[in-house]
Curated annotation (Swiss-Prot):
Keyword check for Acetylation: yes
Residues carrying N-acetylalanine: A2
UniProt organism field: Pongo abelii
Pfam families assigned to the protein according to its UniProt record, in alphabetical order: Gal-bind_lectin
Location within or outside the cell: Secreted, Extracellular space, Extracellular matrix
Function: Lectin that binds beta-galactoside and a wide array of complex carbohydrates. Plays a role in regulating apoptosis, cell proliferation and cell differentiation. Inhibits CD45 protein phosphatase activity and therefore the dephosphorylation of Lyn kinase. Strong inducer of T-cell apoptosis.
Gene Ontology CC: extracellular space
Protein name: Galectin-1
Length: 135
C-alpha cells in the first residue's frame, strides 16, 4: 500500500500520547493510521471506513504480526464527518492501546505484539494530516 506519510524511529513509550490531527476529505471513503515496529509488524491498524470494503461508518482495528493479519475488531461509534477536522489520540501500555476519538469516546485494542515502544507510523487514505504531536 502506498502511504501518504511514513515516519520511523518515533520511540513512543508506554503512557505517552500520539496525537494526529487532520482534515477528512469531503468525499472520504476510508483512511488508515498504522502504528507498530515496521510495516509488517503493526500493533494497531486503525481504519475508519465511511463506505469501504463492505463497511459503512465503522472503525475497523487490527494488528499485523510478521505480515499476518490478526482478528479484526469493529467499533460502531463513528464521530468522523467528511469535510471536517478530526483529532485522534493514541496511548499504549503492555496490555492495550487506548484510542480517544474526536467526540471524546475511548476504546481499547489489545497490544497483541507486546511492544515496549512504537517506532513506526504510516498514514494513508482520505485524511490530510495537519499535525502530529507527542505528549
Amino acid at each position: 500500500m502506498a502511504c501518504g506519510l511514513v515516519a520511523s524511529n518515533l520511540n513512543l513509550k508506554p503512557g505517552e500520547c500520539l496525537r494526529v490531527r487532520g482534515e477528512v476529505t469531503p468525499d472520504a471513503k476510508s483512511f488508515v493510521l498504522n502504528l507498530g515496529k515496521a510495516s509488517n509488524n503493526l500493533c494497531l491498524h486503525f481504519n475508519p471506513r465511511f463506505n469501504a470494503h463492505g463497511d459503512a461508518n465503522t472503525i475497523v482495528c487490527n494488528s499485523k504480526d510478521g505480515g499476518a493479519w490478526g482478528t479484526e475488531q469493529r467499533e460502531a461509534v463513528f464521530p468522523f464527518q467528511p469535510g471536517s477536522v478530526a483529532e485522534v489520540c493514541i496511548t499504549f501500555d503492555q496490555t492495550n492501546l487506548t484510542i480517544k476519538l474526536p467526540d471524546g469516546y475511548e476504546f481499547k485494542f489489545p497490544n497483541r505484539l507486546n511492544l515496549e515502544a512504537i517506532n513506526y507510523m504510516a498514514a494513508d487514505g482520505d485524511f490530510k494530516i495537519k499535525c502530529v504531536a507527542f505528549d
